[in-house]
Each structure stands twice: as structure tokens, then as C-alpha cells.
Amino acid sequence: MNGSTARTGTTTAPATGAASTEAGTGAGTAAGTTVEQLKLLHRRRTFGAWFKDKGWRHLVGIAVTIFAIFPLLYVLSAAFNSTGTLVGSNALFSKLDLGNFTALFNDPSRPFGRWFVNTMVVGVVTSAATVFLGAMAAYAFSRMRFKGRRIGLLSLLLLQMFPQLLAVVAIFLLLSGISEVIPALGLGSQLGLIMVYLGGALGVNTYLMYGFFNTVPQSLDEAAKIDGASHVQIFFGIILRLVTPILAVVGLLAFIGISSEFVIASVVLTDPDSQTLAVGLYSFVAQQRSENWGVFAAGAVLAAVPVMALFLFLQRYIVSGLTQGSVKG
């Protein structure tokens, strides 16, 4: 009996120890699983909070970037694809050659080089004149008090509500009449086109510069007047140096708008040798069954180069010029 009991006790002790070990292992496994689940839940909550706070902004930014870059990539692909159709450019950069650029400069009936020079001349002259005349007008409105000042500022804003497209017929008749007296300012002349552009650009740009001029303390003008400086000396010696950002912004915006303007330029410039890029490039796609979109895309790429170069050169002035010019002191 005692031997049996001893053997029974001897055999049950290891069984109890094994059960305890299995229970401990199970508890440890359950605890480990719970910790992992908590970590996973925490990660999910952290990602949800991040996406709700900032993540959606990144998603919107990526979508907007793709939406903006895709047309540029498509135009580049069409420019380097000599098939001449946009359908052949659906597979981006499937074919790369310079055939379109060669054809662009080898067509004597379509002088692309002359169009490029015309665009640069019209754009530079108009931008420079807009900056200079607009700065003088903004200085007068900002620093001088004269009869009709408020009415003049209000008129500048009201005139900008009517697009130049509504005045195309009037512009055509006006230049047609001027060409009978002063041919250099009439139809077919680049100088006449520059005058039309100046009339449309001075209003909004003058008001934009007027707001920036008001941020310059008038104490500088008063100190210069005490030293005997005139308005001309104050304007050229002091004010222009302090308002360089807004001058750069106005010049850049004017140049971009003029380089891409088509409607008025197509009405005023009738001679192919005097046309700008926007009007000249349209001839590549104007005729049905003979349009060449590849050459058109190549010309558009080259036309964008000066604008991009000017934008990069004046980039440091753009933000400060627009933000300060939008606040009227």
C-alpha cells in the first residue's frame, strides 16, 4: 500500500508541474497577443489622427501636383514625337527625336525665329513701359493730393471689370482710323499693338503698385524735402529702390500676359512677318487635315523658355511683392 501510494505521489507531481508550466505559457502568450493588439490599435489610431490632421493635405497636394504636371509632360512628349498628332503621344515619351524642332525652323512660310523676336520686343517694351508709367501714376496717387484723385482710383478699378475682348471691334476701328494718319501706330504695326496692351495693363498694375507705395513711410519723403529734394529726385532716388519687389512682379505678370495673348494680336497684326508667337503658332493647327500638333507643341515649349527664365530670375521678389502690394496703407 505504501509503495503504491508513493508511486502515485511520485507520478502526480510531474503532471501538476507540467500543468502549471502550460498555464504559465498560455498566460504569457495571451499577454503577448494583447500587447501586440494594443500596439496595432495604437498605430491605427495614430495614423488616423495624422491623416485627419495633416495627411489629407499631402494627398491633396499630390493630386494637384499630378494634375498640374501631366499637361506639361504631355506637351513635352508631343514636342519630341515627330508623328505630328496628339494621339501618337498618348504613350508618353514613346518616341524621342528632334524632327518637330527642325521643321519649326525650316519652314520659310512660317518664320518662327522672327515671331520669337517679335514677341520678345513687344513683351519687353510693353513690360518696361507698364512698370515705368504705372510706377509714376502710383506715386502720384500715393503721395500727392489733387482734385479727382479718388475718382481716378475708382475709375481704374471700374475699367478693369470690362475685358479687352469686348473692345476688339472698337480697337480695330480705332487703329484703322489711326493708320490713315499715322501708319506706324495703325493696323499691322507692333507699336500700335504695344499701345493697346499699355491701355489694358496700366489700370490694374497702377492700383497694385499704389497699394505697395502706401507701405513706404512718408517720413522718408519729408526728410528728403527738408534736404531740398524734388518729387523727381525722391521718386528716382528713394522710392524706386524701396519698391523693387512690386516692380518685378508687375513686369513679370505683364510679360507673361503679353507673351500668351492671342485675340488682340491676331486682330492688330495682319502681316506674318510682324506676328507674335501666339498668332504664328496657331497657323500650324488652324487648317483642318493639315495641322501638325507636334510642331505646335515644339514651338510652345520654346516659347515657354523665356518666361520660365524670367520667373526664376525674379522669384525672390514675387512673394513679398504680391503680399505687400495687396495691402493698402
Which residue ranges define each predicted feature?
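A hydrophobic, multi-pass inner-membrane permease signature
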Residues: N2-T8, A15, T21-G329
